[in-house]
Amino acid sequence: MNIISEHGFRIDGRRPAQIRNINTRLGLNRNAEGSCYLEHGNTKVLCAVYGPYEGKSSKRIEDKCAIVCQYSATKFSGLERKNRTRGDRKSTEISRLLEKAFESVILTEAFPRSQLDIFCEVIQGDGSNLAACVNATSLALADAGIPMKGIASAATCGVVDGKPIVDLTSREETDLLPRVTLATICGRDEVILVELQNRLHIDHLSTVMDAAKATCADVYECLAVVAQQHLKACAPILGN
């Protein structure tokens, strides 16, 4: 199957450097301090943030807040038809990646000896799932009013015939394309997460990294608008 047609289009009609539509809804989970439902193309993610609250003794850190992430995916979320419950190897790996990323984003020193829980569930996976979780988590944290260095944005990019393609779908990922998931703060050069899937030739590394950084900047612009609009909508309520 050709990833890019002779006319320069991908299977879903996008150009190689074109991202999918991003739609979000914040504050849906009233039991959480912050929440976000995010659709990135056909990838759908729900994220909820709880805390900060007094941390468990096993998790407690004297001078900062402990970040605990749990990732899961529903049974019919993707092509695998496999339920990724909290605790399987891949889910644990993604959970740790999210923890490390957001430890670099959240101002954890503002909440010593406390704990912040982040739950991410992929309801429907159509590629770039980890990137979508990062983006949903950023908005859920913003909804919760958690102080951060800035909004984190992420993107998954691959290489076809030495040329980058951005925001991969599930069908593109199943072709075992060399790909990188990258996350940055405020769409700038401060990288907080890098995940490499499949072998990538060293000659293509800088190309795909540059494409991923540029895509993170594009995604950040979308997320920043959502966060600003949500803040404006909440301002009258907070004022009362």
Curated annotation (Swiss-Prot):
One annotated Gene Ontology cellular component of this protein: nucleolus
Keywords in alphabetical order: Cytoplasm, Exosome, Nucleus, RNA-binding, rRNA processing
Keyword RNA-binding: yes
Principal localisation: cytoplasm
CDD domains: RNase_PH_RRP41
Gene Ontology biological process terms, A to Z: nuclear mRNA surveillance; poly(A)-dependent snoRNA 3'-end processing; rRNA catabolic process; rRNA processing; U4 snRNA 3'-end processing
An MF annotation (GO) of this entry: RNA binding
Keyword Nucleus: yes
Cellular compartment(s): Cytoplasm; Nucleus, Nucleolus; Nucleus; Nucleus, Nucleoplasm
Family indicated by similarity: Belongs to the RNase PH family.
Functional summary from the UniProt entry: Non-catalytic component of the RNA exosome complex which has 3'->5' exoribonuclease activity and participates in a multitude of cellular RNA processing and degradation events.
Quaternary data: Component of the RNA exosome complex.
More info: Exos-4.1 and tin-9.2 are transcribed on a dicistronic transcript where exos-4.1 is the upstream transcript and tin-9.2 the downstream.
Identification of the protein by name: Putative exosome complex component RRP41
Source organism phylogeny: Eukaryota, Metazoa, Ecdysozoa, Nematoda, Chromadorea
